[in-house]
Every structure is written in C-alpha cells, then in structure tokens.
Amino acid sequence: MSKQTVKNKLHKLTFPQQKEEQPKKKAVEFLYIDADEDHVSLQFKEKKGDLETGENNWKNNCVLAKLVYVYEGIEPECPKSKRHKLVNPHYFSGVYDGADNAELWDEVYAYLDSHYDLKKVKKIYLNADGGTWIQSGKKRIAGITSVLDEFHLQKYLLKMTSHLKDSADDARKEICDAVKSGTKADFQSVVGQLKVCAETEATEKRIEESGAYILSNWTAAKIRLKDRETVKGCSAEGHVSHVLSSRMSSRPMGWSRTGVDKMAHLRAYYWNGGDMLELVRQQERELPVAAGTENEVLSCESMLRWERHRHNKLGKYIESINHSVSTEVKKYAWFHAHIWGL
C-alpha cells in the first residue's frame, strides 16, 4: 500500500459517536484529569511553501496535538510492584484549534456525566502546566480544582536553585515552605535572596522568570504541595510520549493539519481499547458504479481479443499492450477482499 493511499485513508477516517449513557453510573469521591500537548511539525499550513522563517532561522511549522485523559486514581501494577497504573483511564486527543477547544472540553464533560454520578464526586483535580487552553476547561466543567503538575514545579525549582550547588536542596525546601504555608510576599522575599546570590545576569533572569511562573500558578502550586494525600502525581508528560510522540514527533516527520488531527483521534481510539477492524467496517464505502453497468467488467481474454482486432484494423506498427498486474496491486486486492469478508 502506497504512502499516498495511507494518507487518503487517514484523512477520510471517521470515528463512531460516544456510546450512550450507561445503565448505572459509577460513584467515586475523586476524579482526575491530566492534560498536555505534543508539538508536531507541519509540512505546510494551508498550502505547500507557506511556512514562515523567524529571526532565528527556525520555521514556524508547529501545531499542537492536545491530549486529555480522565481516570479514577492510581494503583500498583501488581501487589508488590513499585510501578503504578491509572484506574479506568479514558483518552481524548486532537488539534482543536481556537474555538474548537471548547468542543474538546465538552466531550470530556459528556464522558464524565455519562459514566459517573457527579453529585457524589467531592473534587475533580486538573493536573497540568497552567497552559491557556487547559485552564479554559474550567469554564466548561464546573468545580474543577487546578493543580500544578509535579514535573513543571520541580523544573522551575531546579532552575531557581541550580547555581547554588551544595546549598540547592536547602534552598528548594525553603521555596516549597514559602509556597506551601506562606504568602506571595514570603515567596518573593526568598526569590530576592536567590537573585542576590546570582553571579551572572543570565542566572538572575532565569530566577526571575521561574519565580514569575510559580506566581502565575500560585494556587495550583500551593494545592500540589499541601494536599499530598488526595492529589496524585501527574503522568501527562509520559502519556504524551507514549500516546502521541511515539507515532507523530519522536522521529523526523512532516504532517498536514488534517493528518495530525486524524492521527491524534486514532491514537486516542486505540488507547481506549477501540476495535480497529470494527472501525474499518464503519467507514463509508466508495460509491458503486452506475446502475446497469455492474456486469460490464472486461476479462483479460476479452481485452486481448479487442486489442488484436484493433491491431489488425490500424496496422502492424500500432503499440500493443504489454503489461501485467503488479504484486503490490494483487496484495491490495486480496487484503481488501479479505477485510470486508470478515
């Protein structure tokens, strides 16, 4: 099967609607939503050759493939395992640019409402990095509590203290105490002390930017550090890697916007346990030939007979047919007939 055929099949792919409401909704105390995105490279935006190059000679050819997944908590993979797995996860993914972002969160809410008794849910935690498209989910789903994910919190703590070497651990503990139990003024005081110890302007700028990030996500960071019992660690970075990046961006690839959206939906469908053969069966078939011409299929013998007749009529120097069906076409015809015959 050629690359062009794969692209055509992917772009025409349609997905089944979400299943109807379950007879009995689950009753759980806490629900968790993790969200992040994958940065996928485009070959073009609207048409080939329309990519712009910035001042740093980098092409502006990135599109966000968004990933949101809902789960009930975590549990060990086996009784004595140190590794954990998500309990009943469900994935949502796609491009969802601009106003379509609301559609993504509406899909998440529809799933929650159809599978859980939301009146009995005490809290819904949203673990994320504070991105704008993620925070907009709070406008579509009431009662969400934002939590800054551990990865980004530790990332900016390390940025603020990496220049302190042996004293870095003590400095990080002081910062965490200020966020957990103090006020913004206490935190800014600690940031000021760190800037005094900075040896270069670059280090001072890094401390200032990291402090500004934590301040912009102040409540979410405070909940992360204070509510350790019910707040679970965020696995969004790992899930983006496994669900999206492994297929779309870990290796050099160029996509179209439609291709990114369809492949992201397909990856979510696969990780939700979707049946690939059933998905193939549900696709629209190509339109049949016009009525009355179904049986007008020329056999090889009739084609050769027609060519001989044409050859005699037009002269011996007329070009004759000398071709056979390729192995690739034979394989495609056999595979297509086999799939639809299941």
What are the functions of these language-model segments?
Residues 1-342:
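Catalytic center-proximal scaffold of phosphoryl-transfer enzymes
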